Amino acid sequence: MAVVTLKQLLEAGVHFGHQTRRWNPKMKPFIYAERNGIYIIDLQKTYEQLEAAYSFVRDASKEGKTVLFVGTKRQAQEPIREEAERAGMPYVNQRWIGGFLTNFRTIRTRIKKYKELLALREQGYIESLDYKEQKRVMRELEKLDKYYSGVKDMDTLPDILFVVDTKKEEAAIREAKKIGIPVVAMIDTNCDPDLVDYPIPANDDAVRAIKLITSKIADAILEGREGRQGIVSSEGQQASMEEIAEELEAIDETEKYLDLIDEEKEEE
């Protein structure tokens, strides 16, 4: 049984790469063709790479390991939060804080401070302060909430990073590699697959594509921890890229930009 079908990948727009002038040659093995100025990702390769990543994450989850979800670009913020929360995992969906992994001792003190302020607010203590002090504390709490709400229960370094857009999250990946944390990531045609341990070739700009891939990583965690399988029917999984090629013939460059992305594709 498959964790996803080629039809699902196609319908989510996972196959849309970047314009041909914006590509990384290392992505060539994952590219099926060029259509009207954009590269088309080979969904068979996406299928295979996602299966490998799914198995890796599922097995890690069986051992009680933690996956940190990372995606700070506009299109990724909600899928990252929703799927990480569904899987009971920490997440970063705002700005990546430098040293989050490599200087986690300091980060942990900030998380502790954040939790202390949350407790004080819950107890009504902040409301008892004078107006000026109350405003100062609330500003501090709002700032901490923005950057640390997704990791407030994370007491130790994560075992795995799941990342959307390796170019955007270059700092996070660099820190993970420095301390030996394996990385699973969605990689578009402008990315370097060699930077991650489990690359998943996919359109990392469309909300639907991000949601689909991220949900499968969450499914893998739940299956590993609870035996809750996130598999789908095997119907359609044997379809090849050649068999769905006719779906790609009429592709227009604007489809990646307008049909599948809520707002115009972010420039590098």
From Swiss-Prot:
Keyword terms, alphabetized: Ribonucleoprotein, Ribosomal protein
Keyword ATP-binding in record: no
Gene name of the record: rpsB
Superkingdom per UniProt: Bacteria
GO biological process terms held by the UniProt record: translation
Name of the featured protein: Small ribosomal subunit protein uS2
Matching Gene3D superfamilies: Glucose-6-phosphate isomerase like protein, domain 1, Helix hairpin bin
GO molecular function: structural constituent of ribosome
Family: Belongs to the universal ribosomal protein uS2 family.
UniProt GO cellular component terms: cytosolic small ribosomal subunit
SUPFAM superfamilies in UniProt: Ribosomal protein S2
